[in-house]
């Protein structure tokens, strides 16, 4: 009851769950007939936006088509009920019937599965936080000197990620943090600073990477970065002889090696670390199940830092629900240019022009040809085509000494075209290489294409990626989707969008396995993530809430005013939907004011209906925070209805009563009615917003 709850002076803590909504449930890129999920009605097909007028009040609605050609009109103020459908191939996407009970049954079953998954995830989490780890001590002076020798300026996201990692390491609970950022965005510097802190605390560091070439590159970079410090850094890969490997292993075991970088070889059983304190895993998804089990064995009770440019669903699941800590690096280094991507049918003319353009400006070229048996023939073919180029080949079947020599020569610009397999896919960083040509790009996965494209554009020069396919007409459906996706995802910090598109193309079943994914395909990945996060919250708090409570916690705001961005203000539908989505997923007033400024800057002063839209979003935010269930109002007054378990600051509410004593009265135990003659809608909305702010303060 409200009267009882008024006595409780506890303030409600409002959590920021925007991460999943902004990156997984982004509606702004919807296309006509694309599948979409409504929480209460199921999976339909998006049909665009339309303006609906009721009693001279205009609102814009999302139109969703359901089975039997039924249509549902969803006001943009209820966008929180909608999410993109991600889950299975196009032909298998469900289409529900309005008014049919099947959707509720599927949703209920998925919710039960979400609770099962949440229990497993929380068990992992509770095991981790119950472990006693090492609390790293700060070494201010040394650390400051180390940081000052970094030759670049940190981006804000880099700085934030580093601070989060160090904060984790200072705690006695073992760190388990994922740093997610696009290729070339500075994840390695985060790892280096964590490594430095560990070494200062006399702890050993293991850096696990998926490929020999990446291990060699990390070894070179770490050696250069630590050259002013007495830090012993070694590398363990197939580039070393057996004798050298045994020598390194022995030195690790007795503590003479401080940092060991390597492939899966660093998981060998005969490695007995003397004082391992930090494990850094680069591109975790590249390791198989067996290697991941070995990682678990060596990572017990130590801090673990994982770096990735291509997050996978399970990793995202654990990060989004708070089981793993997550840092995102989404801002590029200064002067970094977006890689220009072109799709062309295989053409010798295109290849010659692309190679010549690059080498004539003093640059270098990767030519990806993923058929090792014929790669020598391809080199000869390209040499005839572009005699001006100095061409060599590189692939994983070469002797380790030969491959190391080739990559070293390429790095030092001793030749300018490398015809290679996907061995260069992960992490190789050669700033002078600014053109990549991928032959038979239709045969590569989306994440692979993204990683390969990330090998170029590592400097201030404009970089180019050429995706060559045998035929644009005959390309298979899924391959076309991958090619279309990689060309459309050109913006910086697009790793989350990449993960979503990969889910859309491959389907949940292929990525998570059919046993785990059946219930997800029926409701979509976006909604499943909401159910999972809700389940985790409820289990943590020790209760089970009904399914509908997920939505019922959102207050209903009915103020009888037009609140929309009219097409006379923003003409393009998807631009309006973009801003509607941004407003709907904002979690604080500052974000909403930034949206207001962006709108004014790009489209001019907001019309009244746009101003009301943003203010109503603020009213909804603060109403949710203080436990308001519904607000209904017109020009003569209205009422505020509270949830029974609302926790309101009684003193602040009494202050509001005293300001306008004749304005208020309770008409039920949970409903507070107000009577007031407002001059206009603007005054009324401002009054309601300010009143809620005063109650909350």
UniProtKB/Swiss-Prot annotation:
Its EC number is 3.6.4.-. Transmembrane segments: none annotated. GO terms for biological process: DNA repair. GO terms for cellular component: cytoplasm. It is found in: Cytoplasm. SUPFAM superfamilies: CarD-like, P-loop containing nucleoside triphosphate hydrolases, TRCF domain-like. SMART domains: CarD_TRCF, DEXDc, HELICc, TRCF. GO terms for molecular function: ATP binding; damaged DNA binding; DNA helicase activity; hydrolase activity. InterPro entries: CarD-like/TRCF_RID, CarD-like/TRCF_RID_sf, DEAD/DEAH_box_helicase_dom, Helicase_ATP-bd, Helicase_C-like, Mfd, P-loop_NTPase, RecG/Mfd. ATP binds at residues 181-188. Keywords: ATP-binding, Cytoplasm, DNA damage, DNA repair, DNA-binding, Helicase, Hydrolase, Nucleotide-binding. Residues 350-504 form the Helicase C-terminal domain. Residues 168-329 form the Helicase ATP-binding domain. NCBIfam families: mfd (TIGR00580). In the N-terminal section; belongs to the UvrB family. Couples transcription and DNA repair by recognizing RNA polymerase (RNAP) stalled at DNA lesions. Mediates ATP-dependent release of RNAP and its truncated transcript from the DNA, and recruitment of nucleotide excision repair machinery to the damaged site. This is Transcription-repair-coupling factor. It comes from Buchnera aphidicola subsp. Baizongia pistaciae (strain Bp).
């Amino acid at each position: 009851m409200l009267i009882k709850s008024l006595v409780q002076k506890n303030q409600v803590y409002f959590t920021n769950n925007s991460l999943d909504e902004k990156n997984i449930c982004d509606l702004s890129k919807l296309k006509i007939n694309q599948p979409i999920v409504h929480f209460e009605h199921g999976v339909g097909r998006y049909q665009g936006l339309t303006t609906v007028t009721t009693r001279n009040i205009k609102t814009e609605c999302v139109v969703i088509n359901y089975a039997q050609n039924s249509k549902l009109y969803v006001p943009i103020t209820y966008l929180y009920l909608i999410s993109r459908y991600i889950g299975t191939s196009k032909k298998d996407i469900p289409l529900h019937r309005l008014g049919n009970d099947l959707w509720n049954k599927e949703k209920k079953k998925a919710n039960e599965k979400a609770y099962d998954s949440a229990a497993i995830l929380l068990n992992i989490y509770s095991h981790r936080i119950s472990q006693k780890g090492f609390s790293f001590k700060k070494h201010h002076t040394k650390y400051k000197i180390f940081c000052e020798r970094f030759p670049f300026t940190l981006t804000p996201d880099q700085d934030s990620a580093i601070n989060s990692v160090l904060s984790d390491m200072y705690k006695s609970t073992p760190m388990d943090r994922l740093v997610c950022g696009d290729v070339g965005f500075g994840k390695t510097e985060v790892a280096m600073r964590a490594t430095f802190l560990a070494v200062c605390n006399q702890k050993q560091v293991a850096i696990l990477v998926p490929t020999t070439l990446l291990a060699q590159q990390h070894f070179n970079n770490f050696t250069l970065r630590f050259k002013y410090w007495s830090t012993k850094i070694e590398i363990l890969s197939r580039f070393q002889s057996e004798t050298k490997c045994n020598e390194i292993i022995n030195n690790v075991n007795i503590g003479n090696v401080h940092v060991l970088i390597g492939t899966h070889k660093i998981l060998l059983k005969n490695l007995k670390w003397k004082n391992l304190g930090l494990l850094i895993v680069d591109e975790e998804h590249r390791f198989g199940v067996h290697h991941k089990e070995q990682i678990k064995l060596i990572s017990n009770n130590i801090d673990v830092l994982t770096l990735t440019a291509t997050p996978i669903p399970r990793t995202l699941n654990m990060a989004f629900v708070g089981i793993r800590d997550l840092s995102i690096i989404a801002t590029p280094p200064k002067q970094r240019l977006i890689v220009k991507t072109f799709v062309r049918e295989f053409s010798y003319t295109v290849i010659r022009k692309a190679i010549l353009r690059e080498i004539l400006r003093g640059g270098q070229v990767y030519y990806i040809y993923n058929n090792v048996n014929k790669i020598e023939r391809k080199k000869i073919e390209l040499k005839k085509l572009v005699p001006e180029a100095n061409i060599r080949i590189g692939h994983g079947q070469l002797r380790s000494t030969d491959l190391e020599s080739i990559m070293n020569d390429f790095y030092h610009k001793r030749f300018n075209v490398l015809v290679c397999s996907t061995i260069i896919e992960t992490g190789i960083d050669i700033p002078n290489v600014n053109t990549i040509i991928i032959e038979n790009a239709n045969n590569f996965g989306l994440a692979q294409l993204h990683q390969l494209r990330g090998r170029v554009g590592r400097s201030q020069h404009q970089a180019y990626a050429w995706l060559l396919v045998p035929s644009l007409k005959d390309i298979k459906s899924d391959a076309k989707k991958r090619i279309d996706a990689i060309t459309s995802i050109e913006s910086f910090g697009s790793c989350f969008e990449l993960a979503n598109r990969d889910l859309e193309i491959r389907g949940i079943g292929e990525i998570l396995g059919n046993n785990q994914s059946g219930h997800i395909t029926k409701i979509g990945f976006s909604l499943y993530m909401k159910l999972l996060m809700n389940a985790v919250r409820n289990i943590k708090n020790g209760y089970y809430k009904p399914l509908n409570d997920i939505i019922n916690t959102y207050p209903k705001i009915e103020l009888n005013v037009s609140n929309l961005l009219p097409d006379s203000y923003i003409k393009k539908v998807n631009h309006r939907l973009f801003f509607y989505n941004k407003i709907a997923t904002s979690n604080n007033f500052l974000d909403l004011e930034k949206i207001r400024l962006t709108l004014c800057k790009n489209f001019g002063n907001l019309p009244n209906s746009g101003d009301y839209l943003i203010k109503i979003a603020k009213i909804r935010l603060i109403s949710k925070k203080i436990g308001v269930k519904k607000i209904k109002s017109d020009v003569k007054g209205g009422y505020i209805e509270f949830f029974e378990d609302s926790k309101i600051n009684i003193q602040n509410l009494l202050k509001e009563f005293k300001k306008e004593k004749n304005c208020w009265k309770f008409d039920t135990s949970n409903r507070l009615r107000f009577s007031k003659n407002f001059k206009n809608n603007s005054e009324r909305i401002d009054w309601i917003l300010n009143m809620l702010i005063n109650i909350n303060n």
